[in-house]
């Protein structure tokens, strides 16, 4: 692991806050010694989520109206890897947090944010999501900003018309699918043409609803290259039951699932052709373009016979980090504090169907997602199994073949072999 580079300072935080008219009390930042330089400090803000680029442009404009010491340049088009390769990372990033971002943490290239008051406001169960992928010494390299919680989107009218209650056990889920099938309603609209939808939905929900995902991958890593059907932990040993159930659920899909993609699924679901859709909250806006008044809800996919086992799939839809190589860390911290002020972060999550990450965050109020709030509050959530699998393993292609063939055993054998191969080379 390379040593951490010293912080390169431009204007001090005290100078920036004073010039910005955003006092330390307002932003909760302590002062520090002054550094060289004066005038306006420009920082590059890396945020590429396409549906909220305009949203953050508006936030940046409001920040500029409130002060004149810091100018934020919104970079929404770059790629993370080339920036680090060229030694030109942004001053502040607010991105989806996944395994590809997490691989930078052990290298010590993100600055430690643990001394920021905002870090103390993060729910411990949410901050733990960061550590599940990677850690670096005793530091806080990434601050969560927004959680996207996912489950089964369902058409409330179709459930009511067919006398189906929201299932809370595996047997109830199967019974619901049988009822819809008998009534001529497609139980689950699937979009197997785009394999990411299989990984995010059927695979992640099936596995996450049945096992402790993080514990499984922790134990799998401990096995090293000694992974097989008979080892203490393996895909074949631990995932056999959830994958068998995944294959069962796939059979309740629309007959043309293999030729239908994400957009097709949103349109068909909006037209009322299916009762359930295994997608995240990002699908709501697309569905609303066709059926703005469609009454929808969401529930966690039940994979056991105990309702107490219900969990939501989550991902850190946005998380913040400041590179050590930034020459404007103090200014970046000021803007990050602004972004994490309750009036900004809470409004963002409310407007974008996200769940809050702070101890004082208000509960979600949109009726489409409120059913997941108790699970978020209780920490009954998991990051999808597919997100732990490196890109060097083409799991999405494997899953696409599995839902077509129904051969879950071959999938698990292949995953064990691929994982073993990577472990040998590591």
Predicted features along the sequence, with ranges:
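Conserved C-terminal helix/tail region of periplasmic/extracytoplasmic solute-binding proteins
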Residues: 2-3, 160, 378-426
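Conserved N-terminal structural module of periplasmic/extracytoplasmic solute-binding proteins
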Residues: 2-103, 107, 118-120, 258, ...
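Short helix-initiation/N-cap motifs at beta->coil->alpha
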Residues: 75-82, 170-174, 257-270
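Hinge/lid segment of periplasmic solute-binding proteins
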Residues: 98-150, 174, 201
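Mature extracytoplasmic/periplasmic domains
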Residues: 110-115, 266, 271, 281-289, ...
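Extracytoplasmic/periplasmic solute-binding protein
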Residues: 141-143, 174-228
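Glycine-centered hinge/linker elements that transmit conformational signals in sensory
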Residues: 220-257
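Periplasmic-binding protein-like
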Residues: 296-320
């Amino acid at each position: 692991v390379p040593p951490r580079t010293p912080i390169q300072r431009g204007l001090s935080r005290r100078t920036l806050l004073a010039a910005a008219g955003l006092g330390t009390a307002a932003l909760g930042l302590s002062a520090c010694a002054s550094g060289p330089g004066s005038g306006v400090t420009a920082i590059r803000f890396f945020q590429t989520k396409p549906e909220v680029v305009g949203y953050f442009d508006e936030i940046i404009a409001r920040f500029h109206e409130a002060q004149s010491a810091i100018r934020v340049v919104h970079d929404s088009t770059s790629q993370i890897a080339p920036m680090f390769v060229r030694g030109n990372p942004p001053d502040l990033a607010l991105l989806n947090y996944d395994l590809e971002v997490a691989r930078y943490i052990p290298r010590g290239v993100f600055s430690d944010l643990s001394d920021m008051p905002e870090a103390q406001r993060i729910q411990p169960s949410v901050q733990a999501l960061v550590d599940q992928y990677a850690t670096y010494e005793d530091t806080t390299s990434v601050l969560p900003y927004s959680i996207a919680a996912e489950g089964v989107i369902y058409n409330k009218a179709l459930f009511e018309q067919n006398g189906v209650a929201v299932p809370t056990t595996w047997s109830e889920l199967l019974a619901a699918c049988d009822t819809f099938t008998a009534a001529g309603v497609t139980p689950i609209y699937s979009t197997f043409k785009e394999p990411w939808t299989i990984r995010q939905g059927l695979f992640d929900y099936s596995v996450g609803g049945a096992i402790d995902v993080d514990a499984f991958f922790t134990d799998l890593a401990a096995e090293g290259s000694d992974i097989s059907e008979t080892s203490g932990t393996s895909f074949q040993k631990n995932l056999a039951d959830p994958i068998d159930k995944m294959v069962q659920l796939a059979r309740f899909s629309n007959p043309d699932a293999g030729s239908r993609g994400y957009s097709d699924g949103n349109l068909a679901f909006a037209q009322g052709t299916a009762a359930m859709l295994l997608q995240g909250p990002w699908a709501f806006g697309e569905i609303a373009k066709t059926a703005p008044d469609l009454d929808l809800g969401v529930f966690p996919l039940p994979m056991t016979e105990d309702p107490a086992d219900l969990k939501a799939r989550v991902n850190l839809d946005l998380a913040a980090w400041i590179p050590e190589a930034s020459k404007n860390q103090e200014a970046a911290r000021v803007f990050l504090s602004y972004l994490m002020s309750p009036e900004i972060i809470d409004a963002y999550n409310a407007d974008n169907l996200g769940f809050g990450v702070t101890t004082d965050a208000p509960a979600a109020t949109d009726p489409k997602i409120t059913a997941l709030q108790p699970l978020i509050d209780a920490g009954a959530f998991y990051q999808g199994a597919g997100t732990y699998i490196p890109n060097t393993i083409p799991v999405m292609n494997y899953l696409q073949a599995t839902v077509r063939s129904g051969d879950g055993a071959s999938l698990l054998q292949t995953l064990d072999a691929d994982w073993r191969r990577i472990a040998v080379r590591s």
